[in-house]
Protein backbone atom coordinates (compact mmCIF):
# COMPACT_ATOMS: atom_id res chain seq x y z
CA UNK A 1 0.00 0.00 0.00
CA UNK A 2 1.47 3.34 -1.05
CA UNK A 3 1.95 6.06 1.51
CA UNK A 4 0.01 8.64 -0.59
CA UNK A 5 -3.24 6.70 -0.36
CA UNK A 6 -6.14 8.77 1.10
CA UNK A 7 -9.88 8.31 1.62
CA UNK A 8 -11.73 10.39 -1.08
CA UNK A 9 -15.08 10.63 -2.89
CA UNK A 10 -15.01 10.85 -6.68
CA UNK A 11 -17.05 13.72 -8.28
CA UNK A 12 -18.12 11.31 -10.99
CA UNK A 13 -20.48 9.61 -8.50
CA UNK A 14 -22.96 12.34 -7.46
CA UNK A 15 -25.63 9.91 -6.19
CA UNK A 16 -23.28 8.18 -3.78
CA UNK A 17 -23.77 9.43 -0.25
CA UNK A 18 -21.01 8.94 2.27
CA UNK A 19 -21.95 6.67 5.10
CA UNK A 20 -21.53 7.63 8.72
CA UNK A 21 -18.91 5.54 10.36
CA UNK A 22 -19.68 3.94 13.73
CA UNK A 23 -16.55 3.47 15.77
CA UNK A 24 -18.16 2.20 18.96
CA UNK A 25 -15.87 -0.05 20.99
CA UNK A 26 -13.96 -1.16 17.95
CA UNK A 27 -10.25 -0.52 18.32
CA UNK A 28 -8.23 -1.23 15.25
CA UNK A 29 -5.94 -4.17 15.92
CA UNK A 30 -2.64 -4.54 14.16
CA UNK A 31 -1.00 -7.90 13.77
CA UNK A 32 2.61 -8.73 14.33
CA UNK A 33 3.30 -9.81 10.77
CA UNK A 34 1.99 -9.04 7.32
CA UNK A 35 1.09 -12.66 6.77
CA UNK A 36 -1.64 -12.39 9.41
CA UNK A 37 -3.13 -9.27 7.86
CA UNK A 38 -3.28 -10.63 4.29
CA UNK A 39 -2.79 -7.16 2.83
CA UNK A 40 -3.10 -6.73 -0.92
CA UNK A 41 -1.45 -3.73 -2.62
CA UNK A 42 -4.59 -1.58 -2.66
CA UNK A 43 -6.84 -3.20 -0.07
CA UNK A 44 -6.76 -3.05 3.72
CA UNK A 45 -9.32 -4.96 5.75
CA UNK A 46 -10.46 -3.33 9.01
CA UNK A 47 -12.52 -5.90 10.92
CA UNK A 48 -13.78 -3.45 13.51
CA UNK A 49 -15.82 -1.41 11.00
CA UNK A 50 -18.85 -3.69 10.65
CA UNK A 51 -16.75 -6.21 8.71
CA UNK A 52 -16.90 -4.15 5.50
CA UNK A 53 -14.14 -3.99 2.94
CA UNK A 54 -12.73 -0.53 2.21
CA UNK A 55 -11.03 0.35 -1.03
CA UNK A 56 -8.31 2.94 -0.81
CA UNK A 57 -7.81 5.27 -3.74
CA UNK A 58 -4.25 6.09 -4.52
CA UNK A 59 -2.80 8.47 -7.06
CA UNK A 60 -2.80 5.73 -9.69
CA UNK A 61 -6.12 3.94 -8.92
CA UNK A 62 -9.74 5.17 -9.21
CA UNK A 63 -12.21 5.04 -6.36
CA UNK A 64 -14.38 1.96 -6.41
CA UNK A 65 -17.81 1.36 -4.90
CA UNK A 66 -18.24 0.10 -1.39
CA UNK A 67 -18.97 -3.56 -0.93
CA UNK A 68 -21.65 -4.72 1.55
CA UNK A 69 -20.39 -8.29 1.54
CA UNK A 70 -18.39 -9.26 4.65
CA UNK A 71 -14.73 -9.63 3.89
CA UNK A 72 -13.27 -13.13 4.21
CA UNK A 73 -9.91 -11.48 4.85
CA UNK A 74 -11.35 -9.70 7.87
CA UNK A 75 -12.77 -12.96 9.20
CA UNK A 76 -9.36 -14.56 8.79
CA UNK A 77 -7.82 -11.75 10.85
CA UNK A 78 -10.31 -12.29 13.69
CA UNK A 79 -9.71 -16.01 13.65
CA UNK A 80 -5.97 -15.54 13.79
CA UNK A 81 -6.30 -13.08 16.63
CA UNK A 82 -8.39 -15.47 18.74
CA UNK A 83 -6.12 -18.37 17.91
CA UNK A 84 -3.12 -16.38 19.11
CA UNK A 85 -4.86 -15.49 22.37
CA UNK A 86 -5.76 -19.12 22.96
CA UNK A 87 -2.24 -20.36 22.53
CA UNK A 88 -0.91 -17.88 25.08
CA UNK A 89 -2.48 -19.81 27.98
CA UNK A 90 -0.69 -23.13 27.37
CA UNK A 91 2.63 -21.29 27.13
CA UNK A 92 2.04 -19.81 30.60
CA UNK A 93 1.00 -23.20 31.94
CA UNK A 94 4.10 -24.78 30.45
CA UNK A 95 6.30 -22.20 32.16
CA UNK A 96 4.56 -22.99 35.45
CA UNK A 97 5.12 -26.72 34.94
CA UNK A 98 8.82 -26.16 34.23
CA UNK A 99 9.13 -24.05 37.36
CA UNK A 100 7.40 -26.76 39.40
CA UNK A 101 9.70 -29.46 38.01
CA UNK A 102 12.77 -27.39 38.83
CA UNK A 103 11.54 -26.91 42.39
CA UNK A 104 11.03 -30.67 42.81
CA UNK A 105 14.50 -31.42 41.45
CA UNK A 106 16.11 -28.93 43.83
CA UNK A 107 14.10 -30.33 46.74
CA UNK A 108 15.16 -33.88 45.89
CA UNK A 109 18.80 -32.82 45.55
CA UNK A 110 18.64 -31.19 48.98
CA UNK A 111 17.19 -34.38 50.50
CA UNK A 112 19.97 -36.50 49.00
CA UNK A 113 22.59 -34.07 50.32
CA UNK A 114 21.04 -34.23 53.80
CA UNK A 115 20.89 -38.02 53.62
CA UNK A 116 24.61 -38.27 52.85
CA UNK A 117 25.62 -35.58 55.33
CA UNK A 118 23.69 -37.14 58.22
CA UNK A 119 25.30 -40.51 57.40
CA UNK A 120 28.80 -39.05 57.44
CA UNK A 121 28.30 -37.33 60.80
CA UNK A 122 26.63 -40.39 62.32
CA UNK A 123 29.45 -42.76 61.36
CA UNK A 124 32.22 -40.41 62.47
CA UNK A 125 30.75 -39.47 65.87
CA UNK A 126 29.42 -42.97 66.48
CA UNK A 127 32.85 -44.47 65.85
CA UNK A 128 34.46 -42.01 68.27
CA UNK A 129 31.96 -42.83 71.04
CA UNK A 130 32.26 -46.60 70.52
CA UNK A 131 36.04 -46.38 70.55
CA UNK A 132 35.97 -44.47 73.85
CA UNK A 133 33.26 -46.41 75.74
CA UNK A 134 33.52 -49.98 74.37
CA UNK A 135 29.82 -50.41 75.14
CA UNK A 136 27.90 -51.08 71.88
CA UNK A 137 24.68 -52.04 73.66
CA UNK A 138 24.62 -48.83 75.68
CA UNK A 139 25.34 -46.73 72.60
CA UNK A 140 22.58 -48.50 70.66
CA UNK A 141 20.15 -47.96 73.54
CA UNK A 142 20.98 -44.24 73.64
CA UNK A 143 20.29 -43.95 69.91
CA UNK A 144 16.89 -45.61 70.26
CA UNK A 145 16.11 -43.43 73.29
CA UNK A 146 16.91 -40.16 71.49
CA UNK A 147 14.89 -41.29 68.49
CA UNK A 148 11.94 -42.16 70.74
CA UNK A 149 12.06 -38.70 72.32
CA UNK A 150 12.00 -37.06 68.89
CA UNK A 151 9.07 -39.21 67.80
CA UNK A 152 7.14 -38.37 70.95
CA UNK A 153 7.72 -34.65 70.40
CA UNK A 154 6.53 -34.95 66.79
CA UNK A 155 3.32 -36.65 67.88
CA UNK A 156 2.61 -34.41 70.89
CA UNK A 157 3.14 -31.20 68.89
CA UNK A 158 1.17 -32.70 66.00
CA UNK A 159 4.13 -32.24 63.65
CA UNK A 160 3.30 -35.68 62.32
CA UNK A 161 0.00 -37.46 62.64
CA UNK A 162 -0.12 -39.86 65.58
CA UNK A 163 -1.26 -43.27 64.33
CA UNK A 164 -3.99 -45.47 65.70
CA UNK A 165 -2.48 -48.94 65.93
CA UNK A 166 -4.41 -52.09 66.70
CA UNK A 167 -3.12 -55.02 68.71
CA UNK A 168 -2.97 -57.16 65.58
CA UNK A 169 -0.77 -54.60 63.85
CA UNK A 170 1.58 -54.40 66.84
CA UNK A 171 1.89 -58.18 66.83
CA UNK A 172 2.77 -58.09 63.13
CA UNK A 173 5.32 -55.29 63.63
CA UNK A 174 7.05 -57.00 66.58
CA UNK A 175 9.24 -59.35 64.46
CA UNK A 176 10.33 -56.37 62.37
CA UNK A 177 11.29 -54.50 65.54
CA UNK A 178 13.33 -57.47 66.79
CA UNK A 179 15.45 -57.78 63.65
CA UNK A 180 15.74 -53.98 63.41
CA UNK A 181 17.14 -53.89 66.94
CA UNK A 182 19.60 -56.69 66.24
CA UNK A 183 20.69 -55.13 62.95
CA UNK A 184 21.64 -51.83 64.56
CA UNK A 185 23.29 -53.56 67.51
CA UNK A 186 25.46 -55.73 65.26
CA UNK A 187 26.43 -52.70 63.18
CA UNK A 188 27.61 -50.85 66.29
CA UNK A 189 29.49 -53.93 67.48
CA UNK A 190 31.32 -54.07 64.15
CA UNK A 191 32.10 -50.34 64.16
CA UNK A 192 33.60 -50.75 67.63
CA UNK A 193 35.95 -53.49 66.42
CA UNK A 194 37.06 -52.51 62.90
CA UNK A 195 37.32 -49.37 60.78
CA UNK A 196 34.25 -47.60 59.44
CA UNK A 197 35.35 -48.21 55.86
CA UNK A 198 35.74 -51.95 56.41
CA UNK A 199 32.35 -52.27 58.16
CA UNK A 200 30.61 -50.59 55.24
CA UNK A 201 32.56 -52.68 52.74
CA UNK A 202 31.25 -55.83 54.43
CA UNK A 203 27.75 -54.34 54.53
CA UNK A 204 27.93 -54.16 50.75
CA UNK A 205 27.13 -57.89 50.96
CA UNK A 206 23.48 -57.09 51.77
CA UNK A 207 22.27 -57.97 48.23
CA UNK A 208 23.75 -61.46 48.62
CA UNK A 209 21.69 -62.09 51.76
CA UNK A 210 18.63 -60.53 50.15
CA UNK A 211 18.79 -62.95 47.22
CA UNK A 212 19.51 -65.92 49.49
CA UNK A 213 16.69 -65.26 51.98
CA UNK A 214 14.17 -64.37 49.27
CA UNK A 215 14.88 -67.67 47.53
CA UNK A 216 14.63 -69.65 50.77
CA UNK A 217 11.50 -68.10 52.32
CA UNK A 218 9.66 -66.35 49.49
CA UNK A 219 10.42 -68.71 46.62
CA UNK A 220 11.78 -65.88 44.47
CA UNK A 221 14.19 -67.29 41.92
CA UNK A 222 16.97 -64.82 41.05
CA UNK A 223 17.52 -63.94 37.41
CA UNK A 224 20.87 -64.54 35.69
CA UNK A 225 21.41 -60.77 35.74
CA UNK A 226 21.11 -60.70 39.54
CA UNK A 227 23.40 -63.69 39.99
CA UNK A 228 25.93 -62.04 37.70
CA UNK A 229 25.88 -58.90 39.86
CA UNK A 230 26.35 -60.92 43.07
CA UNK A 231 29.68 -62.36 41.89
CA UNK A 232 31.70 -59.08 41.97
CA UNK A 233 30.09 -58.18 45.32
CA UNK A 234 31.27 -61.38 47.00
CA UNK A 235 34.64 -61.31 45.27
CA UNK A 236 35.26 -57.66 46.11
CA UNK A 237 34.40 -58.09 49.79
CA UNK A 238 36.66 -61.15 50.02
CA UNK A 239 39.53 -59.26 48.39
CA UNK A 240 39.05 -56.27 50.71
CA UNK A 241 38.87 -58.52 53.78
CA UNK A 242 42.15 -60.34 53.23
CA UNK A 243 43.96 -57.02 52.79
CA UNK A 244 42.24 -55.11 55.63
CA UNK A 245 44.68 -53.78 58.23
CA UNK A 246 42.10 -53.64 61.05
CA UNK A 247 40.59 -57.06 60.28
CA UNK A 248 39.38 -59.20 63.16
CA UNK A 249 36.77 -61.92 63.24
CA UNK A 250 34.55 -60.22 65.80
CA UNK A 251 34.13 -57.13 63.65
CA UNK A 252 33.74 -59.15 60.45
CA UNK A 253 31.16 -61.51 61.97
CA UNK A 254 29.16 -58.64 63.49
CA UNK A 255 28.92 -56.88 60.14
CA UNK A 256 27.81 -60.12 58.48
CA UNK A 257 25.19 -60.63 61.21
CA UNK A 258 23.98 -57.09 60.56
CA UNK A 259 23.52 -57.94 56.88
CA UNK A 260 21.57 -61.06 57.79
CA UNK A 261 19.21 -59.33 60.23
CA UNK A 262 18.61 -56.26 58.05
CA UNK A 263 17.67 -58.38 55.06
CA UNK A 264 15.56 -60.62 57.28
CA UNK A 265 13.58 -57.51 58.12
CA UNK A 266 12.88 -56.92 54.43
CA UNK A 267 11.82 -60.53 53.91
CA UNK A 268 9.64 -60.48 57.03
CA UNK A 269 7.91 -57.31 55.89
CA UNK A 270 6.86 -59.17 52.73
CA UNK A 271 6.08 -62.41 54.57
CA UNK A 272 4.07 -60.92 57.41
CA UNK A 273 2.31 -58.47 55.09
CA UNK A 274 1.66 -55.69 57.55
CA UNK A 275 -1.60 -54.05 56.52
CA UNK A 276 -0.95 -50.41 55.77
CA UNK A 277 -3.59 -47.72 55.76
CA UNK A 278 -3.47 -43.93 55.69
CA UNK A 279 -2.18 -43.78 59.29
CA UNK A 280 0.66 -46.30 58.79
CA UNK A 281 3.09 -45.05 56.18
CA UNK A 282 6.82 -45.80 56.11
CA UNK A 283 7.79 -43.01 58.51
CA UNK A 284 5.08 -44.01 60.98
CA UNK A 285 6.13 -47.66 60.74
CA UNK A 286 9.75 -46.70 61.39
CA UNK A 287 8.67 -44.60 64.37
CA UNK A 288 6.74 -47.48 65.92
CA UNK A 289 9.67 -49.86 65.34
CA UNK A 290 12.02 -47.37 67.04
CA UNK A 291 9.79 -47.19 70.13
CA UNK A 292 9.52 -50.96 70.28
CA UNK A 293 13.29 -51.32 69.83
CA UNK A 294 13.83 -49.08 72.87
CA UNK A 295 11.58 -51.31 74.96
CA UNK A 296 13.34 -54.44 73.71
CA UNK A 297 16.86 -53.06 74.11
CA UNK A 298 16.60 -51.53 77.59
CA UNK A 299 16.38 -54.70 79.73
CA UNK A 300 19.00 -56.55 77.66
CA UNK A 301 21.45 -53.66 78.05
CA UNK A 302 20.94 -53.30 81.80
CA UNK A 303 21.45 -57.03 82.39
CA UNK A 304 24.54 -57.38 80.17
CA UNK A 305 26.47 -54.10 80.27
CA UNK A 306 24.87 -52.44 83.26
CA UNK A 307 24.64 -48.66 83.40
CA UNK A 308 27.69 -47.28 81.63
CA UNK A 309 26.42 -43.90 80.56
CA UNK A 310 26.73 -42.14 83.91
CA UNK A 311 29.26 -39.32 84.43
CA UNK A 312 31.09 -41.33 87.10
CA UNK A 313 31.62 -44.33 84.83
CA UNK A 314 32.72 -42.16 81.91
CA UNK A 315 35.20 -40.32 84.12
CA UNK A 316 36.55 -43.62 85.45
CA UNK A 317 37.20 -44.67 81.86
CA UNK A 318 39.37 -41.58 81.45
CA UNK A 319 37.09 -39.93 78.89
CA UNK A 320 35.78 -36.37 78.80
CA UNK A 321 32.15 -36.54 79.94
CA UNK A 322 30.96 -33.48 78.02
CA UNK A 323 32.51 -34.67 74.76
CA UNK A 324 30.99 -38.14 75.07
CA UNK A 325 27.52 -36.76 75.80
CA UNK A 326 27.74 -34.24 72.96
CA UNK A 327 29.02 -36.72 70.38
CA UNK A 328 26.51 -39.36 71.49
CA UNK A 329 23.66 -36.88 71.11
CA UNK A 330 24.83 -35.75 67.66
CA UNK A 331 25.29 -39.35 66.52
CA UNK A 332 21.82 -40.32 67.76
CA UNK A 333 20.17 -37.30 66.13
CA UNK A 334 21.91 -37.99 62.83
CA UNK A 335 21.01 -41.69 63.08
CA UNK A 336 17.32 -40.90 63.38
CA UNK A 337 17.43 -38.03 60.87
CA UNK A 338 19.09 -39.97 58.05
CA UNK A 339 16.55 -42.77 58.31
CA UNK A 340 13.66 -40.30 58.24
CA UNK A 341 15.15 -38.55 55.20
CA UNK A 342 15.70 -41.92 53.53
CA UNK A 343 11.97 -42.67 53.76
CA UNK A 344 11.16 -39.17 52.47
CA UNK A 345 13.34 -39.82 49.42
CA UNK A 346 11.77 -43.25 48.88
CA UNK A 347 8.35 -41.58 48.77
CA UNK A 348 9.54 -39.35 45.88
CA UNK A 349 11.58 -41.73 43.71
CA UNK A 350 11.43 -45.32 42.50
CA UNK A 351 12.99 -48.15 44.56
CA UNK A 352 15.70 -48.57 41.91
CA UNK A 353 16.70 -44.90 42.15
CA UNK A 354 16.72 -45.18 45.95
CA UNK A 355 18.97 -48.26 45.76
CA UNK A 356 21.41 -46.46 43.49
CA UNK A 357 21.42 -43.51 45.89
CA UNK A 358 22.09 -45.88 48.78
CA UNK A 359 25.06 -47.33 46.90
CA UNK A 360 26.47 -43.85 46.31
CA UNK A 361 25.88 -43.08 50.00
CA UNK A 362 28.04 -46.05 51.00
CA UNK A 363 30.84 -44.79 48.75
CA UNK A 364 30.59 -41.32 50.29
CA UNK A 365 30.72 -42.74 53.84
CA UNK A 366 33.72 -44.95 53.08
CA UNK A 367 35.73 -42.17 51.43
CA UNK A 368 34.90 -39.59 54.11
CA UNK A 369 35.79 -41.98 56.96
CA UNK A 370 39.11 -42.88 55.33
CA UNK A 371 39.96 -39.20 55.02
CA UNK A 372 38.79 -38.24 58.53
CA UNK A 373 40.34 -41.16 60.46
CA UNK A 374 43.34 -41.40 58.10
CA UNK A 375 42.69 -45.11 57.68
CA UNK A 376 45.54 -46.89 55.88
CA UNK A 377 44.26 -48.41 52.65
CA UNK A 378 46.36 -50.70 50.47
CA UNK A 379 45.88 -50.82 46.70
CA UNK A 380 44.45 -54.34 46.95
CA UNK A 381 41.99 -53.22 49.64
CA UNK A 382 40.88 -50.23 47.58
CA UNK A 383 40.48 -52.40 44.48
CA UNK A 384 38.40 -54.97 46.35
CA UNK A 385 36.17 -52.28 47.85
CA UNK A 386 35.68 -50.71 44.43
CA UNK A 387 34.75 -54.05 42.84
CA UNK A 388 32.22 -54.76 45.61
CA UNK A 389 30.58 -51.34 45.31
CA UNK A 390 30.46 -51.64 41.53
CA UNK A 391 28.66 -54.95 41.99
CA UNK A 392 26.16 -53.30 44.34
CA UNK A 393 25.50 -50.59 41.77
CA UNK A 394 25.02 -53.21 39.05
CA UNK A 395 22.66 -55.18 41.30
CA UNK A 396 20.54 -52.09 41.98
CA UNK A 397 20.14 -51.61 38.22
CA UNK A 398 19.33 -55.19 37.20
CA UNK A 399 17.24 -56.49 40.11
CA UNK A 400 14.09 -55.00 38.58
CA UNK A 401 14.59 -56.75 35.23
CA UNK A 402 12.01 -59.48 34.80
CA UNK A 403 12.67 -62.51 32.59
CA UNK A 404 10.68 -62.58 29.36
CA UNK A 405 7.77 -65.04 29.47
CA UNK A 406 8.26 -68.10 27.33
CA UNK A 407 6.05 -68.17 24.28
CA UNK A 408 4.40 -71.41 23.22
Curated annotation (Swiss-Prot):
Reported phenotype of the disruption mutant: Reticulate leaf phenotype. Reduced number of leaf palisade mesophyll cells and increased bundle sheath cells. Small chloroplasts in mesophyll cells. Reduced photosynthetic electron transport rate. Under-expression of CAB3 protein. Reduced levels of aromatic amino acids and phenolic compounds derived from shikimate pathway.
Span of chain positions assigned to the transit peptide in the UniProt entry: 1-85
Alphabetically ordered keywords of this record: Acetylation, Chloroplast, Membrane, Plastid, Pyruvate, Sugar transport, Transit peptide, Transmembrane, Transmembrane helix, Transport
Cross-referenced InterPro entries: Sugar_P_trans_dom, Tpt_PEP_transl, TPT_transporter
Keyword tRNA processing listed: no
N-acetylalanine carried by residues: 86
A biological-process GO annotation: phosphoglycerate transmembrane transport
Tissues/organs with expression: Expressed in root columella, lateral root cap and root vasculature tissue. In leaves, highly expressed in xylem parenchyma cells. In flowers, expressed in sepals, petals, filaments of the stamens, anthers and stigma.
SUPFAM superfamilies in the cross-refs: Multidrug resistance efflux transporter EmrE (SSF103481)
Gene Ontology MF term list: phosphoenolpyruvate:phosphate antiporter activity; phosphoglycerate transmembrane transporter activity
Main location: plastid
Effect ascribed to mutating residue 251 to E: In cue1-7; strong reticulate leaf phenotype
Ranges for domain EamA: 124-241
Family annotation (Pfam families): TPT
Superkingdom per UniProt: Eukaryota
Transmembrane segments: 105-125, 137-157, 165-185, 198-218, 222-242, 283-303, 324-346, 377-396
UniProt keyword Plastid, yes or no: yes
Cellular localization per UniProt: Plastid, Chloroplast membrane
Record GO cellular component, one term: chloroplast envelope
Family in the record: Belongs to the TPT transporter family. PPT (TC 2.A.7.9) subfamily.
Described function: Phosphoenolpyruvate/phosphate translocator that transports phosphoenolpyruvate (PEP), 2-phosphoglycerate, 3-phosphoglycerate and dihydroxyacetone phosphate. Imports PEP to the chloroplast stroma as one substrate of the shikimate pathway, from which aromatic amino acids and a variety of secondary products derive. Required for correct leaf mesophyll cell development and expression of chlorophyll a/b binding protein 3 (CAB3).
Annotated protein name in UniProt: Phosphoenolpyruvate/phosphate translocator 1, chloroplastic
Gene symbol of the encoding locus: PPT1
Amino acid sequence: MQSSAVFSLSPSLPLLKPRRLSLRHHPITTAASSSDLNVSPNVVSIPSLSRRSWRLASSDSPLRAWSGVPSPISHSLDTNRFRTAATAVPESAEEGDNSGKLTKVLELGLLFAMWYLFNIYFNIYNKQVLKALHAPMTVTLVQFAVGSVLITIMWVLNLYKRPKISGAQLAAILPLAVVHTLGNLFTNMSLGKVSVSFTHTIKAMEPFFSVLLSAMFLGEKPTPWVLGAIVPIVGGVALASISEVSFNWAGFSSAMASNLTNQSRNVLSKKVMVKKDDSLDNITLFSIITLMSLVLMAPVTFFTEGIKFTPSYIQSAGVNVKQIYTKSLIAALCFHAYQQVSYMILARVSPVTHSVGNCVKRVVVIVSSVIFFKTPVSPVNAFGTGIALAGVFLYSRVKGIKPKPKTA
